[in-house]
Amino acid sequence: MNSYKPSKLALSTLNCAVLAALFGWSVNTAAAEADIQEQEIEEVVAVGQRLKGSAGAVLQERQNQAFVADIMGADQISRTGDGDAASALRRVTGLTLVDGKFIYVRGLGERYSSTQLNSMYVPSPDPTRSVVPLDLFPSEIIESLSVQKSFSPDMPAHFGGGNVNIRTKSIPSDFLFKVQVGSSYNTSNSDSGYFYEGGDDDWMGRDDGTRALSNVFTTALTSDAGLEGNINSTLEERKNLIQSLDWNVGISKEDVDPAMSFSVAVGDRLESEIGTFGVLAAVSYDNEWEVVQEQSGSSLGSLGCENKCFAQYYDGTSTEQNVRWSGTLNLGYEFNSNHRFELTNIALHDMSDRVRNRNYYDANETEEGVTELRRVDISYEEREMFSSQLKGTHNFPELNNLFFDWYSGLSRANRNAPGGLDVVFQQNYNDGVFESEQLQDVAATNITREYQVLHDDVETFGWNMGLPFYGDGYELELKIGGDFSEKKRDASNVKFGITHRGISDEFTFGNNISDIFADANTSNDAFYTSATGSGIFDDGTTDGDKYSAAHKLDAYYFMADYFFENTWRITGGVRWEDFKQVSIGYQAHSNLFENTLEEIQDVVINEDTFFPSLAVTYIMDEEMQFRLNVSETTIRPDLRDVSTSFFVDPLTEFLVRGSPSLQSSELTNVDFRFEWYMPTGNNLSVALFYKDIENPIEMVELAGVGGASPQLLTANAQSGKLSGIEVDFLTDFGFINKDWSSAFLSGNVTLSDSSVNLGINDSDNVDSLFETQLKEALEADTVSNIVTNNKRRLVGHSEWVANLQMGYDSDDGFHSTSVIYNVFGPRIIVPGTRGNEDAEEKSFHSLDLVYSYFPNFNSKVNFKVKNILGQEKQIEQEGLTLWGQETGTEFSLSYSYEF
């Protein structure tokens, strides 16, 4: 509740002020309490453990929440040494991290969670998903992370596992200046990595135009004749196109530089006759390299072996540079304790530049000791987000403490991925002795170039107002509000090949693409097999590679929060959402629709639904309470889930297509939690949860052709269920001996089970929704032999997850250390088809050490060791390694100064 409650759970005036400053909360509680009693605070000297000091505020917030939530503060994130929101959230009870970007809450995939920035909807730079990659948010800008696991009417109804609210740092209470510098080294970088020339601005995380398509090339792509031209196209024209591309992409082996980072923050609060003004400005920069050994396979079957094996297999080195920078500028104004305005501006930028040099086995092409293959690919990607958020908080004591809050935001997310390269070299041997290397001598093979662009724009605004009522032994707050957002996305992908058959044989020899496509070669008429250069290009861009999408959400909600005799708290309400979404694909290299207007209208999502929620809290005493939450929510199809065009998922590199008849999933959620907050700061919570899912959205593999990537279909299963138990605790060791109270143990364990029934049953002569969608995609009469397991666990679900942290804070306050352990149980990544078992990611044991030394009140030296065990990450199928990556141990050292 937003208004002050003189109850056993009421916060003290000091705590209210601290919480309001820390989390940018509405000032309703603090203002109402300040009206009751003003205190003069002189000097307070606090002595205590750093962990309990940092966790106390967030625990008190969790205790006073009406709904089940877990909260992680900035100091807790700093203590674990995690560099971004995604890494930090894997420490939260029941959460697992997938691909370093997306969070699975209680085993439900990323589509089952939603992300907000300061309680506002934000865009995503991912071309295939609406959910925001959480690695985009550096820990330097985060004040706290709130994961609400039970639905409340004032949050989006697109809710499955949970809602992640990233709350950024707000205006400081006093002058602040902080600077931090650091460096790190990864043991995997002891091996040399592979590099190419790139652009002059790569250190800034930006391409300077080196990788971009030239105007002459884009003009050719959109012309009536197309990339290949017509019968009148000349050799000179095709030469100009070839030479306009960046061919300075030959790789070489070099040593890797250590990572470096720095951040600066400055802020202040100024009192004046017309109110209080505040400002906080911060910038951060990080540049790091990682060299890892990778293996991957595709096309599981019996080709080339007696039992099962992969027809294609890769094994080699991946070198990746990541450059991240962020900037924030927050402005605040308080007219008085009842009226507050805050403007938050955030800029986030993340560049990834990856080179892979891998040995490539193809059962159809490789002959060991005679003809062997090597594959080189380059992937460059920039992701960024810009967000401006304005919000106001207003209290009216003269109107019985009526309050009114509002917000408005403009955000844009961009993704730019120019100059992608994929080339296969053939190594020739004579009696096992290496003789030469050339472009693969197969007529159908291409050198692939790819260029992707995405813009995602979001406008959002909302408001809520409430009125508290006080009576004999009860308190009641009524609250209404509205949330409104509009999102528009434009994305394009240009893909084409330079054919090996279009190049004369003598020019295909060499092991470096820069040498083969040197100007001296491409300007030579003999380089081309045709006198006019025809056949040199293969346009791989397809219908739907360029698309536009939009959605609009209008929502209103009503909530009542009833508090009786300081013992019972009943919070409930209903949310109504009117949701519209459309995705339109274009024909290749044109602005003409891929589908007819009737077909587009058939896949428009237009839903308006009520979503109820009820939360009951029984407060046994000042330390213990029980919660019960029941709600109904939905999970809607993503932007491309209804398109029949294949697209490449940049995370898995799989080809994915949707189902035009895809429906929203309906969820019934039940949560029960016991919480015990002890006066010493120790705490324990035990939670039971259950979810029933109607029409869960799953993926099934269709087929893979030759060496092509697997093809996946997004479809509705018939039903799904998820249930489990979560335990979360924090205790010091003072119960053993008083001298041991400076050491503590915290952690959480989640045990759960899930099931999904796809709905395949040929015997009933009635097609389920899943069967209909799969038959339409395969153009088949039966699909009973396609899927291996009609009933299985949910994709991405781990049956158990554990986090443990052992820490010590010295009595003199100079030293602090933590050992942090994280592990998850095996989880299905790709469901099995055609008799092959499901592909599972194996458990990964992560062990980190963080030590901090505080020479004085202003300084901090931080030393981290991450991934001490150095375990290999693996996805296995039928006992074979579908994907594997060797990980190193990272050592980092940083120094910060603050006053």
Which role fits each region the language model picked out?
Residues 445-454, 461-470, 475-479, 614, ...:
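Conserved C-terminal beta-signal and adjacent last beta-strands/turns
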Residues 454, 462-464, 513, 517, ...:
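Outer membrane beta-barrel strand-and-loop segments of large Gram-negative receptors
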Residues 334-336, 344-346, 380-391, 395, ...:
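Structural signature of Gram-negative outer-membrane beta-barrels, strongest in the C-terminal barrel
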Residues 124, 136-180, 249, 898:
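A beta-strand signature from Gram-negative outer-membrane beta-barrel systems
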Residues 47-76, 110-113, 120, 125:
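N-terminal periplasmic "start-of-domain" segments of outer-membrane beta-barrel proteins
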Residues 219-356, 384-388, 612-615:
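Transmembrane beta-barrel wall of Gram-negative outer-membrane proteins
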Residues 683, 688-692, 709-827:
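Gram-negative outer-membrane beta-barrel transporters
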Residues 91-93, 120-149, 169, 195-196, ...:
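Short acidic/polar hinge/loop motifs at secondary-structure boundaries
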